[in-house]
């Protein structure tokens, strides 16, 4: 797998005390990112969108801090990360704390919302596959 980029994952976690979502970030080094530029013609004209395909190798330095979403929701904390629908991924390293995803729109052009993911840590090329828009 060609490793062409670092990414920053912003994980959402519900805070039962404040009743708000909190966001924690983790920089992942050495992942593969591919951006597909889709266009479609509709009654409203030409629509375009970027579709992100991200593969995170299981041998990255941060792999040991990964928790499945269920464990992250109850036990995850500082230093852990996960992948779940609704998380945000920024292309490159980002050290900005956020309170909501809209904060990223003010700072970065290249980020996506996780819309699908799978844990493929088996076989000859173990990795996590992430889809986003």
Feature names for model-found ranges:
Residues 21-133:
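Short, conserved turn/kink motifs that form compact alpha/beta structural patches or helix kinks used as
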Residues 1-28, 34:
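N-terminal intrinsically disordered, low-complexity, charge/repeat-rich segments that act as generic
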């Amino acid at each position: 797998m060609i490793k062409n980029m670092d990414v920053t994952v912003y994980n959402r976690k519900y805070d039962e005390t404040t009743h708000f979502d909190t966001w924690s970030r983790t920089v992942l080094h050495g992942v593969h990112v591919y951006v597909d530029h889709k266009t479609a013609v509709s009654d409203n004209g030409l629509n375009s969108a970027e579709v992100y395909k991200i593969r995170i190798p299981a041998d990255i330095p941060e792999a040991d801090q990964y928790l499945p979403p269920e464990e992250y929701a109850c036990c995850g904390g500082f230093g852990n990360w996960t992948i779940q629908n609704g998380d945000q991924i920024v292309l490159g390293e980002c050290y900005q704390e956020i309170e909501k995803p809209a904060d990223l729109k003010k700072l970065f052009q290249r980020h996506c919302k996780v819309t699908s993911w799978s844990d493929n840590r088996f076989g000859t090329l173990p990795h996590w596959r992430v889809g986003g828009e």
